[in-house]
Swiss-Prot record:
<comment type="pathway">
    <text>Carbohydrate metabolism; fructose metabolism.</text>
</comment>
<comment type="function">
    <text>Catalyzes the ATP-dependent phosphorylation of the ketose sugar fructose to fructose-1-phosphate. Does not produce fructose-6-phosphate. The sugars D-glucose, D-galactose, L-rhamnose, D-xylose, L-arabinose and D-ribose are not substrates of this enzyme.</text>
</comment>
<keyword id="KW-0808">Transferase</keyword>
<comment type="similarity">
    <text>Belongs to the carbohydrate kinase PfkB family.</text>
</comment>
<protein>
    <recommendedName>
        <fullName>Ketohexokinase</fullName>
        <ecNumber>2.7.1.3</ecNumber>
    </recommendedName>
</protein>
<keyword id="KW-0418">Kinase</keyword>
<keyword id="KW-0119">Carbohydrate metabolism</keyword>
<dbReference type="InterPro" id="IPR029056">
    <property type="entry name" value="Ribokinase-like"/>
</dbReference>
<dbReference type="GO" id="GO:0004454">
    <property type="term" value="F:ketohexokinase activity"/>
</dbReference>
<dbReference type="GO" id="GO:0042802">
    <property type="term" value="F:identical protein binding"/>
</dbReference>
<dbReference type="Pfam" id="PF25270">
    <property type="entry name" value="Khk"/>
</dbReference>
<feature type="binding site">
    <location>
        <position position="319"/>
    </location>
    <ligand>
        <name>beta-D-fructose</name>
    </ligand>
</feature>
<dbReference type="GO" id="GO:0006000">
    <property type="term" value="P:fructose metabolic process"/>
</dbReference>
<comment type="subunit">
    <text>Homodimer.</text>
</comment>
<dbReference type="GO" id="GO:0042803">
    <property type="term" value="F:protein homodimerization activity"/>
</dbReference>
Length: 375
């Protein structure tokens, strides 16, 4: 049984009092990726055509790989497709905000023409495509996931590409008056420095009612060289002069950013502070399976995360934390309360496999402390 610490108790109590009974909605915009996710399982042992046992954990998968390496033998896995869904930053956050009663728009790599999974799910929303989507095979385990990704048009997307496909006037129409803009993933977008520059220099000056917040998901920057990341840091920090930039990263993404800042630590809070200092943005959120941190110039908030031993879905739990964090910024909640909302959206998602309605979010946040007892 987990026991929430006093800081988490205070944060949950304050969040329960701070969340409004209902939201008025409003426009939000998400760019610039776009994925079609094929959810899969590895087969451990097959009893019949219809019956099999899956490889239960990443540890079990790693053990098989290591055994094969030690034996100097090749290795074969059978895998089962357990569904197809739209994925990536734009899909997960647009889906979550749509379900909570907002009006999301999507500017992303959705296909030429827009591919059917995106049309089927998001055809009622404003959609602008930037080219071919990426494809991800997401292999689910009880303790995590293995994601095999083909990136698509995002790999070469730059500011000129966005301008030529969407047009500055149309992009301004979608952004002006929006409550928030979300952007992801930096790691899949080598030209992000140029896109951040274009947003700051060419788009934001044209807006009469710009969003107050831009949420940036860096993704796994370990796949990008330090020089590439450094160029992005410079432009992301400069973008913060035009709009409040909130960067949100998981534990291992945060650790990489901290190491780029010269900080080696096993303390998640210290790593989050180092990432914040390195990026030069308004806020940095580090989210993990045990705790989450939100850092800004005024200080740091830390909140415990209620875990579940029986998750329905873990792939994209971080995106759903980001959806809650984004909502909290739209609602202008405090640091600790924002973390509770992020954890509540993610917590509902991993337990049910779908994002919450706003009422379901409020119910989870209201019972936040009870979920520690249920772990």
């Amino acid at each position: 049984m987990e026991t929430p610490d006093e800081t988490t108790v205070r944060a949950a109590d304050s969040c329960r009092e701070s969340l409004p009974e209902r939201v008025d909605g409003g426009r939000v915009l998400f760019g610039f990726d776009g994925y079609i996710d094929r959810v899969r399982e590895f087969v451990s042992e097959r009893q019949s055509a219809d019956t099999y046992e899956r490889v239960p954990t990443l540890d079990a998968f790693a053990e098989r790989v290591n055994d094969s390496v030690e034996a100097e033998s090749s290795l074969t896995f059978e895998w089962i497709q357990d569904g197809v869904r739209t994925g990536g930053h734009v899909s997960h956050l647009a889906r979550a905000f749509d379900r909570m009663g907002f009006e999301p728009g999507v500017v992303g790599c959705l296909g030429d023409p827009v591919e059917e999974p995106f049309v089927e799910e998001f055809g009622h929303l404003p959609l602008e495509t930037l080219g071919s989507p990426g494809y991800t095979d997401a292999v689910e385990f009880g303790d995590g996931k293995l994601m095999l990704t083909e990136i698509g048009a995002l790999m070469t997307l730059d500011w000129a590409g966005i301008e030529s496909r969407v047009g500055l006037d149309r992009l301004a129409e979608l952004v002006d008056g929006a409550e928030l803009v979300g952007m992801g993933y930096w790691s899949e977008m080598p030209e992000l420095p140029d896109v951040a520059r274009g947003l700051r220099e060419e788009l934001w000056p044209t807006l009469s009612d710009p969003p107050e917040t831009l949420l940036l998901d860096p993704g796994d920057l370990r796949k990008r060289g330090p020089d590439v990341v450094a160029a992005g840091v410079e432009q992301v920090s400069a973008l913060d002069d035009a709009v409040r930039v909130v960067v949100s990263a998981n534990r291992y993404e945060t650790r990489y950013l901290a190491r780029l800042a010269g900080v080696e630590s096993d303390d998640f809070g210290r790593e989050s502070q180092a990432a914040f200092d390195h990026l030069g943005v308004s806020r940095f959120a580090g989210h993990g399976i045990e705790e989450a941190h939100l850092v800004d110039e005024a200080g740091t908030a830390t909140v415990g995360v209620p875990r579940t031993d029986d998750p329905v879905l873990t792939t994209s739990s971080g995106d759903h934390f980001n959806a809650g964090l984004a909502l909290a910024h739209v609602l202008d909640l405090g640091r600790a309360e924002s973390l509770v909302v992020g954890n509540a959206v993610a917590g509902h998602f991993v337990r049910t496999g779908s994002p919450p309605t706003y009422d379901e979010l409020r119910a989870f946040a209201s019972g936040y402390l009870d979920y520690f007892d249920a772990a």
